[in-house]
Structure formats: C-alpha cells, structure tokens
Swiss-Prot record:
Membrane topology: Multi-pass membrane protein
Bilayer-crossing regions: 8-28, 57-77, 87-107, 129-149
Subcellular location(s) per record: Cell inner membrane
Quaternary structure and partners: The transporter is composed of YjjB and YjjP.
UniProt record, GO biological process: succinate transport
Family: Belongs to the ThrE exporter (TC 2.A.79) family.
Lineage, opening ranks: Bacteria, Pseudomonadati, Pseudomonadota, Gammaproteobacteria, Enterobacterales
Known function: Involved in succinate export with YjjP. Both proteins are required for export.
Protein name: Probable succinate transporter subunit YjjB
GO cellular component term of the entry, any: plasma membrane
Species: Shigella boydii serotype 4 (strain Sb227)
Keyword terms, alphabetized: Cell inner membrane, Cell membrane, Membrane, Transmembrane, Transmembrane helix, Transport
C-alpha cells in the first residue's frame, strides 16, 4: 500500500469513526458544544489504532495504546473546556469496541447449541470471545490509566 492510499484509508477510517462517536455522545446527552470534540477524539483514537495496526502491532495492544491516547487527550480537553473527562472519552472509545468478534463468538455459541459440539465451532467461539474480551479490557484499562497518572497527588517515587 502506497502512502497516498494509506492516507486515504486513514482519512476514511477517521471519518467513519467520528460518526458513531457523535451518535453515542448524543445518546449520552453530551452538551452540544462538546459534540465536535467527541467526534474529533473518536477519529483520533480509531485513526491511531489503525496506524499502530498497520505498523504491525496486534489489535489488542493497538486498542490499549489508542485508548490511553484518548484518555490523555480527554483529560486535557476537560481542563480546557471545564467538563468531566468522560464527556469526551466514553463516546470516543465506542467505535473501537469489538463488534465483529463478539458477534462471531455469539453466533458460534448459538450454532453449538443448535448443532451440537464440533471442534471448529469451539475454536471459533473461543478465539473470538478471547479477542473481544481482550479488546474490551484494553479499552477499559487504557482509558483509566491516564486518570491514575495525571490525577495522582503523591509523588511517583
């Protein structure tokens, strides 16, 4: 993939990630003045995850690093705009949730219950379930670590 194609794919990924970020921000009753920042933060998070995955990092670690970036930027923006960091960060990480792997795991579980046990279905179920669980864990831990670092009152050493 050339540089121009990568930049177009990155721009498309960021634009398509901003749409659900704004949608979920509206569901969470985020103030109207913060909607554009939720969209931008969702685009930054999903774009950074795509860059890290393109560079060879797996999806779990890429999601962890991207959610740490989202958490750090969200804390800084909350200081600038006098809002809680969750106003910006929660809606911004929703586009990174593992919908496809969770859905595939669920479908595999339904097929096992209907058709009976088979090793390929069980492998598909466990692989996708563990991937989805790891991504959700990476999102939650990565989103909470910047708050632990930046709001710490005691010295680190």
């Amino acid at each position: 993939m050339g540089v121009i194609e990568f930049l177009f794919a990155l721009a498309q990924d960021m634009i398509l990630a901003a749409i659900p970020a704004v949608g979920f921000a509206m569901v969470f009753n985020v103030p109207v003045r913060a909607l554009r920042w939720c969209a931008l933060l969702g685009a930054i998070g999903h774009g950074s995850r795509m860059i890290l995955m393109t560079r060879g990092l797996n999806i779990e670690w890429s999601t962890f690093m991207a959610s740490m970036l989202v958490g750090t930027i969200g804390i800084q923006w909350s200081r600038w705009y006098l809002a809680h960091p969750k106003v910006f960060t929660v809606a911004a990480v929703i586009p990174m949730f593992p919908g496809i792997s969770a859905y595939t795991a669920m479908i595999s579980a339904v097929k096992i219950s209907q058709l009976g046990y088979s090793e390929p279905l069980m492998i598909t179920l466990l692989t996708n379930f563990l991937t989805a669980s790891s991504i959700v864990g990476a999102l939650s831990i990565g989103l909470s670590i910047p708050g632990l670092w930046l709001y710490r009152k005691r010295p680190r050493v």
